């Protein structure tokens, strides 16, 4: 969980303009602070369901992480769904307004990924497409939504580790070096993967990932 912090940073690095200088500012559509508020408010709205339901069903989630049958079935169901999701949902429009209601709906659909074996990215992308976002816009918002969601999960796990007296494990032996190295590798690989993924799904859709 700690290593995924590198992947979180990769999203911010790739989309730093979206996080710190939204397009609506350049076009003069909104003032800087209005654009920033709208962007981050949508992230907060989309994250709230995961926070609430994640805390409520934390015991169920952790107790089923090792349920091989459940994970296996969910991978199969998710894969089949991805094979046909491009046909199920009509192509989104670039003119679709990304409202708070749409952000909240995507946030709730993201919670399906709390079932072990369900991909968080898949659930949020499908959520975006169900709200008539384009494949690219849905995929990008999935990555944006991963930042607060994964950061929160990382902080929670570190807190649990420290509160149970395991904080010394972070610095024991070569653990700290391993975590730092793992985070750097995750950062680099995530940047390459995100670039490839966005370009691929924009052109070809999600069927190949369903087979995967």
Question: Which residue ranges define each predicted feature?
Answer:
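Multi-pass membrane proteins that catalyze or facilitate reactions on polyprenyl-/lipid-phosphate substrates
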Residues: 1-212
